[in-house]
């Protein structure tokens, strides 16, 4: 089942690229591939959004220095037995009230937390930019690796096709020699088997080319990749003379330029700032406030009074000694409509302002725990920076050793290829005059093909290892890797 799925994938890739055979294929250079990836890769776009978030956080930190201003308004209905605030009487009625207000508050002192928070957000912007740069560098290396993989597979396919062409010519000549009785028919069968093996090797090599193209196209986030191809613009020469540097020189340069160290150092500074912010919560806070409010009622108001004709007097007491009733005129209030709302707002307005001091005494160890947690994070950041430095040193020395080994392997493979070519030429001369059988000649040919493939492999392996070493030395894959 797994084999069938793999074959289906290969067929789909072959079909997709095959349809474009008649179209004009664009050949991409390494620089074009890297720049396109930097502009379109999803991971890089996410890192760019992180930078934008960090900038927004900085604006929020600046806002902490500004006063907070809030306005409020309300309108309410009271239904049922309520006291009329105008007459003071209890009555069943529906009354309405409106109120508006505003408040202003500003922090005067908050343990310098606002200042330190602003400094932290500035560091966070730098850290997010370093993270974006690191992502760009990683994508550049991945693109370069995938690009060189395509070049290797294309060169390998070229060797396989050239070998098939040679075998087909030799097969045609061998048929003539068999017909002439110069060589036995068994040699002809061996050559046919060799040609068939060459055909199979070409199919495998073509699949490798197409799959490597697909891998790079996906890395570039290409929506249409059927016409995708690359052109070899690489050079085996060490143009920057990087191999003349010592590992310690490369490491010292890397400590100055490598983004992962800058990012770890910035994260350490952020952790230090977090400790200071957490300690600021131990200090008292002082703030100022100002409040304004006013209200209005929609109830009727007393506009005057009139004598109650039904009960013109009312008793208010007795004369001591005679118990004579003391009476006064009984007036009833005359109610009018509610006062104009804006007049009420103007008459009923009130203000309050002052200072508020808050001294932390005990908060369930929350402040102390936050300080301890921030200190743990600080220690973690210190260890991370130290680990990043050790990793960088190991990676530089490993990259230098790999590049040196790749160069030696490439030089050795070229010497081997030269020897295999001479051995093949000698075997061909002997085979052509009947002094060597087809089996031994095929062995010489196979060794030559393997030597050619090894030269190609070591060539592109060396180019990539040099790219990595230059990368640690501060030389980017392309001149400018940022947008």
Predicted regions and their residues:
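Short segments within alpha-helical structural elements
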Residues: 49, 200-222, 411-475
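Membrane-embedded beta-strand positions in outer-membrane beta-barrel channels/transporters
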Residues: 101-103, 147, 251, 354-356, ...
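Sec/SRP-type N-terminal targeting helices
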Residues: 45-49, 62, 94, 108-136, ...
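Membrane-spanning beta-strand positions in outer-membrane beta-barrel proteins
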Residues: 43, 68-70, 113, 204, ...
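Periplasmic alpha-helical coiled-coil/stalk elements that build and connect Gram-negative outer-membrane
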Residues: 2-3, 56, 138-256, 402, ...
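Small/polar, glycine/serine/threonine/aspartate-rich low-complexity segments that form flexible
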Residues: 25, 72-106, 234-242, 289-359, ...
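Bacterial Sec-pathway N-terminal export signals of envelope proteins
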Residues: 23-74, 80, 224, 231-272, ...
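Bacterial Sec-dependent N-terminal signal peptides
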Residues: 1-31, 41, 477-483
């Amino acid at each position: 089942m797994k084999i069938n799925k793999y074959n289906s994938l290969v067929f789909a890739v072959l079909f997709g690229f095959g349809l474009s055979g008649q179209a004009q294929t664009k050949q991409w250079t390494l620089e074009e591939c890297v720049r396109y990836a930097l502009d379109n890769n999803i991971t890089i776009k996410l890192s760019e959004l992180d930078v934008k978030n960090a900038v927004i956080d900085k604006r929020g930190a600046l806002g902490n220095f500004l006063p907070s201003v809030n306005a409020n308004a309300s309108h309410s209905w009271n239904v049922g037995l309520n006291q009329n605030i105008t007459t003071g009487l209890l009555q069943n009625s529906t009354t309405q009230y409106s109120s508006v207000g505003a408040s202003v508050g500003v922090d005067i002192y908050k343990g310098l937390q606002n200042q330190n928070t602003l400094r932290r957000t500035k560091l966070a912007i730098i850290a997010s930019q370093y993270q974006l740069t690191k992502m760009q560098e990683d994508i550049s290396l991945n693109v370069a690796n995938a690009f060189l993989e395509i070049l290797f597979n294309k060169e390998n396919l070229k060797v396989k096709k050239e070998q098939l062409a040679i075998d087909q010519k030799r097969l045609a000549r061998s048929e003539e020699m068999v017909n002439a009785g110069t060589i036995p028919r068994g040699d002809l069968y061996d050559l046919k088997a060799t040609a068939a093996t060459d055909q199979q090797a070409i199919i495998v090599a073509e699949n490798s080319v197409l799959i490597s193209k697909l891998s790079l196209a996906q890395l570039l986030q290409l929506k249409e990749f059927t016409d995708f191809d690359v052109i070899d613009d690489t050079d085996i020469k060490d143009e920057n003379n990087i191999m003349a540097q010592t590992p310690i020189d490369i490491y010292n340069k890397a400590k100055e330029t490598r983004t992962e160290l800058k990012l770890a150092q910035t994260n350490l500074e952020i952790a230090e700032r977090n400790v200071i912010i957490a300690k600021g919560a131990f200090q008292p806070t002082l703030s100022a406030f100002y409040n304004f409010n006013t209200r209005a009622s929609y109830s009727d108001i007393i506009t005057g009074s009139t004598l109650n004709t039904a009960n013109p007097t009312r008793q208010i007491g007795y004369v001591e000694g005679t118990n004579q009733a003391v009476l006064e005129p009984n007036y009833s209030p005359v109610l009018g409509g509610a006062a104009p709302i804006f007049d009420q707002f103007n008459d009923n307005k009130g203000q309050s302002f002052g200072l508020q001091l808050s001294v932390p005494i005990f908060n369930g160890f929350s402040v102390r725990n936050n300080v301890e947690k921030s200190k743990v994070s600080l220690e973690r950041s210190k260890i991370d920076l130290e680990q990043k430095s050790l990793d960088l040193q190991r990676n530089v020395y490993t990259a230098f050793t790999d590049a040196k080994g790749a160069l030696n392997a490439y030089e050795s493979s070229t010497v081997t290829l030269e020897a295999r070519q001479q051995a093949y030429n000698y075997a061909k001369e002997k085979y052509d005059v009947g002094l060597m059988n087809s089996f031994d000649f095929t062995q010489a040919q196979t060794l030559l093909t393997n030597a050619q493939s090894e030269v190609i492999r070591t060539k592109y392996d060396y180019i990539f290892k040099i790219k990595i070493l230059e990368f640690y030395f501060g030389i980017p894959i392309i001149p400018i890797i940022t947008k």
